[in-house]
Amino acid sequence: MAQGILGKKIGMTQMFNEQGEIIPITIVDVSANVVLQQKNVAIDGYNATQIGFDDKKDKITTKPMLGHFKKAKTTPKRFIKEIIFKKENISSLSALAVGDQVSCDLFQVGDLVDVTGTSKGKGFAGVIKRHNQSRGPETHGSRHHRRPGSMGPIKGKIKGKKLPGQMGHQTVTIQNLVLFSVDNQKNLFLIKGSVPGPNKGFVVIKSAVKKLSKEQANAKI
């Protein structure tokens, strides 16, 4: 069953499992998820549930979006995403009415999830840092220390050529992370491993797409 919820990365810590092993944990706040719109094949061409997360002020919200939030009888939201699901993968989100709160009970401890976020921006970086290329000679008259090397033919550009440029600040998805614990009172997810993006960054948590074998799943847990 396809499930999804929005959250904000709080930070990382570590916990002990039942075997006494130290497990790296990412804490994600999933409180105040509100259903803004339900989409279906007949009207929109696909099935999806639009969710809003994290309040923002009215004065920094456009008038069309203010009307959209007013229909859902909720305050303006900073982070809006659609949880798309196929007809055969019916989600319990589709049963919620517009304006309803999305509970963290959608997921259970031990579930495998895919977490999508925006990676940390590193700014302009060279090929050694950005693409892990080897550096050139440092002595004996060489001037090719950290240069990218040949650009290819004079005419035209080669698609996919590894060159210096913006590093990071891209949409990244980490698959098959284990939901280590769920705090229903504080609406917190404790996810085993790292999650893309900085602290206070928004993330989308969905049910894992790729199925693992029993051996792989046990190794994850």
From Swiss-Prot:
> Which parts pass through the membrane?
none
What molecular function does GO assign, one term? rRNA binding
Recorded hits in Gene3D superfamilies, A to Z, give: 3.30.160.810, Translation factors (2.40.30.10)
Enumerate the UniProt keywords alphabetically.
Answer: Ribonucleoprotein, Ribosomal protein, RNA-binding, rRNA-binding
Question: What is one cellular component GO term in this UniProt entry?
Answer: cytosolic large ribosomal subunit
Question: Mind telling me what this protein is named?
Answer: Large ribosomal subunit protein uL3
State whether it acts alone or in a complex, and with which partners, per the record: Part of the 50S ribosomal subunit. Forms a cluster with proteins L14 and L19.
Superkingdom of origin organism = Bacteria
Check the UniProt entry and state the signal peptide residues, or none: none
Cystine links in this protein are none
User: Where does the record place the region Disordered?
Assistant: 131-165
Q: Which family does it belong to?
A: Belongs to the universal ribosomal protein uL3 family.
Q: Name one Pfam family in it.
A: Ribosomal_L3
Q: Does the keyword Ribonucleoprotein apply?
A: yes
Q: Which organism is it from?
A: Phytoplasma australiense
Q: GO terms for biological process? A: translation
Q: What does the UniProt function comment say about this protein?
A: One of the primary rRNA binding proteins, it binds directly near the 3'-end of the 23S rRNA, where it nucleates assembly of the 50S subunit.
